[in-house]
C-alpha cells in the first residue's frame, strides 16, 4: 500500500477504497494515535465515494512508530498533522474533499478546515470534541465523579494534580515496566469512560503507540490556543457540516457540539441516545446526503 514522505523523517501510510472516480472523502481517525481501520469503510457507499484512509504520524503503519521508545515526538503535533493532510491532498491531486472523523479526529478536521476552507467540500463529524483544556480536564479528571473508584486508581499512579502530564512523563521513562504500567492504567481509564472502545484489547504495539501519542498531545493541550477552534468557526461558513453526538457521551459532553453548532453558520446538529460511539447507520445516513 502507498506511503508518503511528509518530512521530519516521517512517512505516513495511506490507502484508498471505493470508486476511483467517485467523490473524494478523507477519513481522519481519532485517538490521537488510534490509527485508521477498514471498519470506517462501512460508513460509505463505495460505489459513490473514493475513500482515503491514512495513519497519522507515529501510529498504524506510519513510520517511525511511537511504540518505539527511540522515536522522537518533537515533530508530532496538531499542526504537523494538518500539514500532512494537505500534502496528501496535493499528492493525490484532489482539488477538495469531504472530511469525516470523530472524537480527536473532529479536532484535527476543524483545525485543517479552518486553515484550508477552500479545500473542503463537506464535513461530517461524530463525537465532537475541540480538545480545549477544559475538555481534556473533564475527560481525565472531571468525569471521575461518575467513576470514583476507577478515578482513584487512575490518578494514583502519578504525583500531584497534573494527571495527564504525569502519565506523559511515565510514558517517556527508560524503564519498560514503568511504561507498561502507565499504558495499562491509561487504557483501563479510557475503557471505563469511552464505552465501546476496548483499548486494552488492542495489539501491544498499537496500544503503546496510542497511549504515548495521547499523553504527548493532551499534556500540550494539542498545541491549540485555548478556544481557537470555536472562535474561528466562522471560517467554516459555506461548508455544509453535520455534527452527530451522543447525549449519553460522558467523556465528551454534548455541550461542545452544541457550542460549535451555534458558532458554525449552516451546520446541523444531530443528537442521538448513544454514548461516545455513534451507530454506523446514523453516520452513513449523513454521508449519503453528499
Regions found by a protein language model. Give the residues of each.
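Catalytic histidine-centered segment of alpha/beta-hydrolase-like enzymes
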Residues: 251, 272-285
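Catalytic histidine neighborhood in serine/cysteine hydrolases
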Residues: 257, 261-277
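Short beta-strand/loop motif that positions the catalytic acidic residue
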Residues: 236-237, 243-245
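Conserved hydrolase catalytic core segment
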Residues: 95-134
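Conserved acidic catalytic loop of the alpha/beta-hydrolase fold
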Residues: 79-97
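A catalytic-pocket lid/entrance helix-loop region that shapes and gates access to the active site
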Residues: 118-166
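Conserved alpha/beta-hydrolase "acid-adjacent" motif
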Residues: 250-256
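Conserved HGGG/HGGXW glycine-rich cap/lid loop of the alpha/beta-hydrolase fold
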Residues: 8-65, 71
